Amino acid sequence: MKPPHADAETSFPPLFPSPPPSPSPLPPPFPPPFPLYEEEFAADPHSAYARMRADHGPLVPVELAPGVPATLVIGYAEALHILRDEYRFPADPRVWQRTVPDSCPVKPMMEWRPNAIRSQGAEHTRYRAANTAAIDAVDEHKLHDLVERISHRAIAGFRPAGQADLLVDFAWPLTFQVLSDLLGCPDSIGHRIADGMNKLFDGGEIAIRGNVILNQAVADLVAVKRNRPGYDITSRLIAHSARLDDTEMSHQIVTLYGAGIEPVVNLITNTLVRLLTDVEFSGDVHAGDASVREALDFVLYRDPPLANFCFAYPPHPVNLGGYLLPAHQPVVISMAGCNNDPALGDPQNASGNRAHLAWSAGPHACPARSQAYLIAESAITYLLDALPEMELACAPQDLTWRPGPFHRAIAHLPVVFPRVDQ
């Protein structure tokens, strides 16, 4: 078809040329990697997981630190697939870490160590067997009594004041002392180990210094226990048929402290946050209609103490459900994101549900979950019995959370209660 003026004898160009045709609309920009290290993420991670899911689905591009890309897994089914497949998703980070400068703030937390968490195959079996044997020999009746004794001492120290920070005054010193006793660690060495672990979990530049402190302290502990063995986890590791050398021993201790201090402290405090802010549930616990164990399971499901932690490094690009995972780039399981996958139902109704990933799954599942449960449950039960009128000393919205890509950790937990002179 001709344009209307095509047959005219004379045609003049328009006074103003027509604009060129509009280009086809560009596709919306792909959302940038989500930074897990910022305070905004720590303040409201569940909203962040919801945005990630809406933008990306179950596999999300993230940054663990500025310029450190990774894939965060927030789909429950996808996480189980990865955790159970050691061949396509090994835990050994050595190829990746060669591409990361020593100044990288998350490198100390993620780098290779000769332990069960960062190994596979025969070496993983060897390390895990030694650790499992040493942990399984813990007498849980004696452990319960130990937790109660240390709880009593901690509460006696702050009870006359009528106020306390349950993180600084209760959960942290209790967990530290219990673990040090189980490992046969002298206080002078244990305090250095705890300082190093705290710095390591916080990430940032301070993590590098924390790694140095930690490595020297655990080396000193191994030397002490080789010379003076006792009935403790460290001595049992030394005596195990795996015949761990000093370097391997040091890394087993680092692993045990890493899995024993920060996660258990966070489990205790996160559970206390729920009991102090959920009046109805707290009332049920005090009345005996709900148990501390149910509160622990709710927190492990909703706000696990290590929110994003299990790492895998595919040796080749992997297509998982239509998502291409790059070779030798971290794949991080978000226990918090996976537990709150809408495919599992409403997480608010998760009380008593133990199908969560807080303890991981597959060959790298936590070997000390029974002991961790016992420590947290015994400590919280003793505290609630000792201070039944305890209340939060601030508005719930004023509680703040420590930033960091790996943990779900309260910064402070202030409470008040009637003063009682000793």
Where are the language model's segments positioned?
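Cytochrome P450
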Residues: D181-S188, T271-V285, C338-L344, E389, ...
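Cytochrome P450 catalytic core segment centered on helix I
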Residues: L183, R192-T247
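Cytochrome P450 heme-thiolate "Cys pocket" and heme-binding signature region
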Residues: D346-L413, Q422
